[in-house]
Amino acid sequence: MSKEEFPSEKNLDKEENTSKPKKAVKKEAAKGEETKKNNENQKLAKEIADLKEKNKDLEDKYLRSEAEIQNMQNRYTKERAQLIKYESQSLAKDVLPAMDNLERALSVEADDDVSKQLKKGVQMTLDALVKAMKDHGVVEIEADGVKFDPTLHQAVQTVAAENDDQKDHVVQVLQKGYQYKDRTLRPAMVVVAQ
């Protein structure tokens, strides 16, 4: 037998050493790949859970933002309607002192024909102004003889009531009050019986 037919002890050791580790290496490699896959799967599962949580937060923020925008639009619509409804309020409030002055001018006695004609012109001017104010929603607050209402009347003075029916009622109007649509422009200044 030649040397080639019988492997030497050294060669046998090499073959045995190489054949065992190959199986072990394959097992370890398979185990390593499995561990690597498990780690990757865990990472991916964690990433998916994080993304789902982030998506949930973003969806919540989106819904809240959408609701806030809707609320802002509703508030804007209401405010705009209020502005349109009460756009003449400041003008009406500014005209009230002029109406008061015209009424004071009418309370003066007219002695001669010129004064009477002047008074008649002032009355016509006041009537036209009152009509224009009514046409735009400004009306005088009823005060004389009615029950005192703090939302419409301002009590400037109180007097003793002559009878029980007169208690808490307006007995004298010192200055007329006016309402514009459903708002009080100026409360009537009144004397109330107690």
UniProtKB/Swiss-Prot annotation:
Residue segments, region Disordered: 1-44
Alphabetical UniProt keywords: Chaperone, Cytoplasm, Stress response
Biased composition regions of type Basic and acidic residues, renumbered to the chain: 1-19, 26-44
The keyword Kinase is annotated on this UniProt entry: no
Gene Ontology MF terms: adenyl-nucleotide exchange factor activity; protein homodimerization activity; protein-folding chaperone binding; unfolded protein binding
Alphabetical GO biological process terms: protein folding
Matches recorded under Pfam families: GrpE
InterPro entries the UniProt entry points to: GrpE, GrpE_coiled_coil, GrpE_head
Locations listed in the record: Cytoplasm
Major localisation: cytoplasm
CC per GO annotation: cytoplasm
Functional description taken from the UniProt entry: Participates actively in the response to hyperosmotic and heat shock by preventing the aggregation of stress-denatured proteins, in association with DnaK and GrpE. It is the nucleotide exchange factor for DnaK and may function as a thermosensor. Unfolded proteins bind initially to DnaJ; upon interaction with the DnaJ-bound protein, DnaK hydrolyzes its bound ATP, resulting in the formation of a stable complex. GrpE releases ADP from DnaK; ATP binding to DnaK triggers the release of the substrate protein, thus completing the reaction cycle.
Subunit and partners: Homodimer.
Family: Belongs to the GrpE family.
Protein name per the record: Protein GrpE
Organism: Lactobacillus acidophilus (strain ATCC 700396 / NCK56 / N2 / NCFM)
